Amino acid sequence: MLRFFLRYTYKPARILASRLPDLRNDLQKSNLYISAEGIIFRSMLFMLISIPFIVVAAYFLAQAGLGIFVIALPVAVVAPLMLMLNLPKISASSRSSALENELPYVVGYITVLAGGGISPFITIKRLSKADAIFPAAAREARRILLDIEIFGMDAISALEKVTKTNPNKLFADFIGGYVAVLKTGGDALSYLESKLKDIFSYTEGKVKRGSEFIGTMAEAYIIVTVVMGISLTILWSTQNLLGGISNGGVGGTVGLGGTQTLNASLIIMFSVLFVPVISLIFIIVIGSAQTREPFSFDLPFYVFLACLPAVAVCYFVPFGLPQYTQLGIGLAIASTPAAILQWRYVKHRKSVESKLANFLRDISEVRKTGLAPEKTIEQLAGRSYGGLSEHIKRISSQLSWGTPMRTVLQNFGASVKSWLTRAMAFLLLEVVDVGGGSTKMFTDLADFTEKNAQLQVERRSMVRPYIMIPYIGAVMVVMTTAMMLYFINPPGLSEAGVPALAPGSIVEKATNILLICSFFQAWVMGFVAGKMGEESAADGFKHATFLVVICIITVYVSFYFISGIKF
């Protein structure tokens, strides 16, 4: 069947490909290894496969009395074609983003090696083997080597091709300028150093723009979740607790037999479905504006999945506590182990990264005395470098035993869980292994590390204030719920002979429903706080736990001062 379909779609695919010249350019800039005709053929195949499903969907919609939605089904027929035609652009954007995150380190790597007299070809060859540290840059280097070693292009021509086929404009401009300097015989090292400064300036501007964007997203998130949640809580409480007055009752929605019922579907759907989906969208959008490392620490997520059944146990098993309190405790129990694991990882990573620039600067200064790199590290083993000290002492011990520098630094890179530290260890290894550990190369590496450390500190300080926004929002939701319940059924009405606006049983059920939704909503908002303020959703486990605990304390403190509400 596939051959039959290919026979009748090959010519239309070729005609369509000839009328879409940008498609070939997009494919060259993407990570897709397929021709323009091939991707059009696949899109037509997916269109053909989707037609029976769309016909069945149209039949069921018509039977359900939703025939108006059948009008939109033809759009679903062409959706596979539009998706496949835009797939190269999506892939090119992903390729560009991954390379841009590594670009300062890659340019710093090329600059350091160029300062030691290493040729561009050797630099590219060594970079192509750095998958463990710079996966995106290593793929780009292998593309260049493929043109040189397989297709017989010279190094300059292969680099010129990069300027036309690479989707990242910053990297393409860097390579284009580098090629121009090599062609004219200019000072390549001076160009690399100036370009490195430009890239740091660009990255600094990107960090500032990203922080402003995160601020805008934080305001939008508060409006969508907190303001809308408070408004919905007030409307729901008014409808369900006071609605019975218009029906001759004293509150609630009058059901069969004159009984009062609560319709909680809307408020539950908002808190359990709408808020998590919106939060996930905000996390993805915020992540697109943040600098991402090639590798991440995913163990907290697996620990959280293992602890997730605790939520069901605490919620459904009666422990003599209000149901919303049991849910809050269950959510806190589920996220606490992951929060502790992530906290320990972040603490260790920061303790190592904070002293890395000082260590490399001390190496460059001691190296000026003429000591060998191995002896230089041994001399620095007695100094205090925070969390980095234990690793330096281990490196010094291994070097004193005669272990080769390459093996020692590779073991060091494997023992730390910080990608930044691994990248710097890789650069240090290249300085010693390729450049012989010259004083200038150590100085260049130290300068680069200090600039990068300053940029990291500035980036964290600019986004950290946004952590408090979800905290304020979660407390507002809980406080609004408590005050709403107080105003609906204030104390002292019975003593004054005034009937209560809503029966105690209805108020108790409404309290349970509203606080269950508020606790879950606050817990979800903690992950957004982690992504906004610490650039990692895994840090959200800590904030989610804190928010649930704060909400529980807020509820009990509020109910202590607001009499007349059962909890």
Enumerate the language-model features and the residues they cover:
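Membrane-helix interface and helix-disruption motif detector
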Residues: 61-67, 256-265, 293-295, 316-325
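Bilayer-spanning, highly hydrophobic alpha-helical transmembrane segments
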Residues: 41-60, 72-82, 205-285, 305-307, ...
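Helix-boundary and N-terminal cytosolic regulatory elements
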Residues: 13-64, 536
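Membrane-cytosol interface segments
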Residues: 1-34, 255-260, 265-269, 281, ...
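Cytoplasmic membrane-interface regions of multi-pass membrane proteins
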Residues: 23, 27-31, 204, 208, ...
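Transmembrane helix-loop junctions at the membrane interface of multipass transporters and ion channels
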Residues: 237-245, 288-291, 310-325, 529-531, ...
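Hydrophobic alpha-helical segments characteristic of transmembrane helices
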Residues: 1-31, 107-127, 151-208, 221-246, ...
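Juxtamembrane/interface alpha-helical elements of multi-pass membrane proteins
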Residues: 69-163, 173, 309-413, 423-430, ...
